[in-house]
Amino acid sequence: MQWLIHFLQRYGFKQIANAQAIIVQSINNSLHNERDALHGFIMTRDLRGFIKQLEQRGQLRRITALVDPDLEIAEIAQRMLQKGGPALLFENVKGSSHAVAVNMMGTVERVCWAMNLEHPAELETLGKKLALLYQPRPPKTVPQAIALGQALFDVLKAKPSRDFLPPCHQIVLKGEDVDLTKLPLLRVYSGDANKVVTLGLMITKDCETKTVNVGVYRLQLQAKNTMTVQWLSVRGATRHLRKAAERGQKLEVAIALGVDPLIIMAAATPLPIDLSEWLFAGLYGGQGVHLAKCKTVDLEVPADSEMVLEGTITPGETGVDGPAGDHMGFYGGVNEAAPLLRFQCITHRKDPIYLTTFSGRPPKEDAMMALALNRIYTPILRQQVPEIVDFFLPMETLSYKTAILAIDKAYPGHARRAALAFWSALPQFTYTKFVIIVDKDTNIRDPRAVVWAIASKVDPARDVFILPDTPFDSLDFATEKAGLGGRMGIDATTKMPPETDRAWNTPLESDPDTAAMVDRRWAEYGLADLNLGEVNPNLFGYDMR
C-alpha cells in the first residue's frame, strides 16, 4: 500500500490520511467482489473454458458430421455470421484428428463474454481504466485518487506468471515430426493460393531491448514446415525483423494457436501504452496471464494454448504469398517476397482444438471485435480530444475506413480541428479514409440521422476537405500508389459566422407539451397494441437481404 501513498505524495495530494483509508477499503472491497464473482461466474482463462461458457448459454453448436476444411467449414461459418448465429465446434474434420472452433466471437455480446464482461455498456468502463493508465494525471480529489489507485492496483494484479507444467507442452513434436499439413487449416475462398492461419498470436522479441511484441497476422501454408506472413510495415514484429537483420541474426518466432479469446482481444488492441500485451490481457481479465517458456526458442507463450508453433525467420529468406481473401472484401495481391517462417517444433495439448476465423466483407468476427474495441477506445479518444463526445466506426466501412465523430462545437473551424486531431490521436486511426463530423445531438449510430446531417448541413465547396498523399493501408488497392493515399473530412455540423453569412434555420421538432400529452393518451387512441419501437428498414426503401 505504501507505494500508492508515495505516488499521491509525489503529486501533492493533501488529504493523504483520509485517502489512504478510503483507498485501502476500496481495494479490499474489490477483492471481496472478485471472490464472490468466482462462485457465480465462469472465469474464462482458456479457450476450453470459453467454449464451456458458450455452451452453457446456448451459444454453441457441436457439428459431428464430417466436414472439409477446404471451403466447406468457411461456407457454413459465413452463413452463421450473416445472421448472428451461434459459435461452431466441428468435431469431425476431414484429414485431421483435431477439432475446429469458429465464430467464437461472432457477436459483440460474445466478445464481451470473452473479456469477462456481461454487457457492451461495460466496455466503456474498461476504456476509462485504460485511459487513466495511458495518461495519468495528478489526482485533485479523493474520488480521483481512488480511481487512479484502483487502476494502478489492477496493473499489479495483471502481472503475468510462469507455469512450469503447462498444458500446451503435453505433446511435443520436433524435427521431421513437424508437419503443418496435418493441422486442420482452412482454405476460405476458391481463389486462395493455399490454406491460412488467421487467429494465431505471433510472439517476437526485440533483439536489443528484449521487448516482446504480440500480434495477430495472417500466415499462409507453403510446405510441411514453412509458412509466409502478411503484415504491415508499421507492426511491432516487422520492426523486430529489421533489427535482427541489422545484427545479422535470425528472428525467433512463436505462434500460439487456440488461446484464451481475451488474449486475442488484447493483442488486437494497438494502444500507445507502455504495457506489454500480456499485462494488457491481465488488465482485461482482472488477473495475470499464465505463461510458459517455449521448447526451442527464447520466448514465452500462453500456457493454456491449444497449440504452439516454434520457428525462426531468416532475414532475406522469402516466399510467394497470395492471393488470399482479405478484410477489404477482395483478393489481396501476390507478394513475391513475403517473409518465410521455418518451424522446428510443435507443442500441443491432448486432443487440441484449432481456433480460427477468416477475413472478408463484413460481417466477420473481426468486425464484431472492432465494434467492441470502438467502445473501449471512446474514453481514451475523449482524453486526447475532449471536444469529441462520441465516435463510431461503422462495420460496413471495414471498421476503420470511416469514422463518425459527434463533437461539442464551440467555435468556427472546430469540426476540422476535431478531424485532424482524430487522425493523430491513436496509431490505428492513421488509416481512416473518411471522417464525418456532426453535432453532439446527432445519433451517430443511426445512418438516417447521419445522412440527413450531411444532406442538410454540408456545402461541398466549403465543408469537404482533402489531405493528399498521407500514409495509407498498403492493402487498400483503391489508392493510386501502394501505401500512400488521401483522406477526406466532411463537416456536417451546424455552421456559425464566419463559416456562413446566412442565418442558420432552426431544425423542426415536435412541440414537447403536445408530445407528452400524446404519450399519456396513446392507449386511449386505441394504438397501444402497435409496436413502434422496431424499425423495418424496408419501409424506407432499404433492402437489407
Regions found by a protein language model. Give the residues of each.
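Short hydrophobic alpha-helical segments enriched in small aliphatic residues
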Residues: G12, A19, E34-A37
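Extended, highly charged
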Residues: H39-L340, Q344-R545
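Short hydrophobic targeting helices and cationic amphipathic motifs
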Residues: H6-L8, S30
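Generic detector of N-terminal low-structure segments
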Residues: Q9, Q15-N18, V24
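Asparagine/serine/threonine-enriched low-complexity, disordered tracts
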Residues: I23, N28-N29, N33
